[in-house]
Amino acid sequence: MSYFKRNEGTIVFAFASIGFIAFYIINYYIRRCRNRAAAAGDIEEARMSPRRPPRGLDAEAIKSFPSFVYTEARGIEPGIGELECVVCLNEFKDDETLRLVPPCVHVFHADCVDIWLSHSSTCPICRAKVVP
């Protein structure tokens, strides 16, 4: 048996391995180029597209929602312990001004929900559409 016949399997394996590695490298390079081109296109598209108008509510509409002091409302609903504002995650304290969001009747710190509603027209908890 000649030397080449004995090592034929090794040679075939080596060429197959080299081919697989070359295929993997080329495939990786092509994907990377596509991702860069797509990212550059997204950036360019974002620059060219007109800016969206603000989606929140205006200040007058926000101020029209009912507001009250926490001390006044604390005794209205018996059985409810400490409540917290889901926007800032702080508990309500005596003498803080709260604001009620009309369609869903959720309550928040007035300052917190005013900022939220100036950017978004939905309730921070249930995402109900807030209409003044």
Swiss-Prot record:
Entry-linked InterPro entries: RING-H2_zinc_finger (IPR053238), Znf_RING (IPR001841), Znf_RING-CH (IPR011016), Znf_RING/FYVE/PHD (IPR013083)
Compartments (UniProt record): Membrane
User: Which pathway or pathways does this protein act in?
Assistant: Protein modification; protein ubiquitination
Keyword DNA-binding (UniProt): no
Which parts pass through the membrane?
10-30
Q: Name one GO molecular function term.
A: transferase activity
Domain of life of the organism encoding this protein? Eukaryota
What class does this enzyme belong to in the EC scheme? transferase
Name the UniProt record assigns to this protein: RING-H2 finger protein ATL39
Species this chain originates from: Arabidopsis thaliana
